[in-house]
Amino acid sequence: MAGKTLYDKLWDDHVVTQRDDGSCLLYIDRHLLHEVTSPQAFEGLQLAGRQPWRLSANVATPDHNVPTSKKERDQGIAGIEDDTSRIQVQTLDDNCKAFNIVEFGINDIRQGIVHVVGPEQGLTLPGMTVVCGDSHTATHGAFGCLAHGIGTSEVEHVLATQCLVQKKSKNMLVRVDGVLGKGVTPKDVVLAIIGKIGTAGGTGYAIEFGGQVFRDMSIEGRMTVCNMAIEAGARVGMVAVDDKTIEYVKGRSYAPKGEQWEQAVAYWNTLHSDDDAVFDAVVELNGAEIEPQVSWGTSPEMVIPVSKAVPTLEQAKDDVQRNDWTRAYQYMGLNAGQALADIQLDRVFIGSCTNSRIEDIRAAAEVVKGRKVAPSIKQAMIVPGSGLVKQQAEKEGLDKIFLEAGFEWREPGCSMCLAMNADKLQPGEHCASTSNRNFEGRQGNGGRTHLVSPAMAAAAAIAGHFVDVRSF
């Protein structure tokens, strides 16, 4: 009998019962909540007269709608100028108090983007099933977790029962061996993977990321990669547990202590695919060949190395891709064969659940130090992923580096990743963004998003256009 994959092990450890149609009832260990996908779920509980099944499994924080300007944040919820945003944040606060759920509120130093806060607090632990009403919940798979996003009705179901009905995915291994070159980051790795397999390449699969590149990668880097598993078409992305994983978790607020810690570590050390495990699909890349990446179009798969030009229609593989590229040229205001350096940038955004952790901010600061934002850039902003990330960056003096260069230093939140708060692009503006999606209108109506790493975004802010950070 063949060995088990990491996904198989996590799945089997959480099956409550298997149903006649092949689906399973899975137990959920951790449920993270935010203000956008939870109101209807809480309302459903109230109408049915139910209470959460296991209070301690649930933790909430507002992130999508919170303003990132200090002026608004200093006034708390009452200072949120947008009515819809204020109501959503207030409703989360009210619901958490009514149901006695732990919330890191808008004025709590622990507040931040839910996928930054969970690991930071030790709420995310190896071997857990982790869900949240947010598609980028795969982030937590970096800890050897089975983590995925859920819809609002499922949020209610988890609150009420601590279980979910799920169908098992197939197994895919994405192996990246070799050593990354100078200036090549985890963001470049995951963009290169998506560029290779496409945004539908992982559909129906749980992706395990393996190989030397991921063994060498930091935990924060692994979070960046797992975060974008959904952009590769997979609902789940994960990396096996190793000593780095355990060291990262150790001593965090919600991590086990004492004898429970020793028991947990013994289990966590089993969370890797067996040597004889069989995957349904295997994709391989050579890490040494990956360059800094830049997305040029309106899908994360429309991505190229910084050394390349916008592709021409002759390079398209079929009529569908030709049609997609033609529409992307028009929306993005680009020409086939255009050099990336010729794209005039308007704004730069460094933040989001993909790239707003302390390592990301350090990487950007290293590029920015002693330089100035180009006069042609209308706005360059740094948005830390949590209050604690912001605090650590300020302790290291990174905020001063950015402020002296002409960047804005903001309060934590999802910010310009999505057009659900005050931080938006204007129609026609090009933005170098460290976020995860570049769909039409994602950062604002008519906004044009280019996905890059923090280092590449920082270099673009200084140059006013895309440059190869390796020679910057």
UniProtKB/Swiss-Prot annotation:
Q: Source taxonomy lineage? A: Bacteria, Pseudomonadati, Pseudomonadota, Gammaproteobacteria, Moraxellales
Which leading EC class covers this enzyme?
A: lyase
Q: Which InterPro entries match?
A: 3-IsopropMal_deHydase_lsu, Acnase/IPM_dHydase_lsu_aba_1/3, Acoase/IPM_deHydtase_lsu_aba, Aconitase_4Fe-4S_BS, Aconitase_4Fe-4S_dom, IPM_dehydratase_rel_enz, IPMI_cat
The biological processes this protein is annotated with in GO are: L-leucine biosynthetic process
| Similarity-based family | Belongs to the aconitase/IPM isomerase family. LeuC type 1 subfamily.
How cofactor binds (record note)?
Answer: Binds 1 [4Fe-4S] cluster per subunit.
Q: Which cofactor does it need?
A: [4Fe-4S] cluster
Binding positions for [4Fe-4S] cluster per the UniProt entry: C353, C414, C417
Organism for this UniProt entry: Acinetobacter baumannii (strain AB307-0294)
Q: NCBIfam families under this entry?
A: leuC (TIGR00170), PRK05478.1 (NF004016), PRK12466.1 (NF009116)
E.C. no = 4.2.1.33
Q: What is this protein called?
A: 3-isopropylmalate dehydratase large subunit
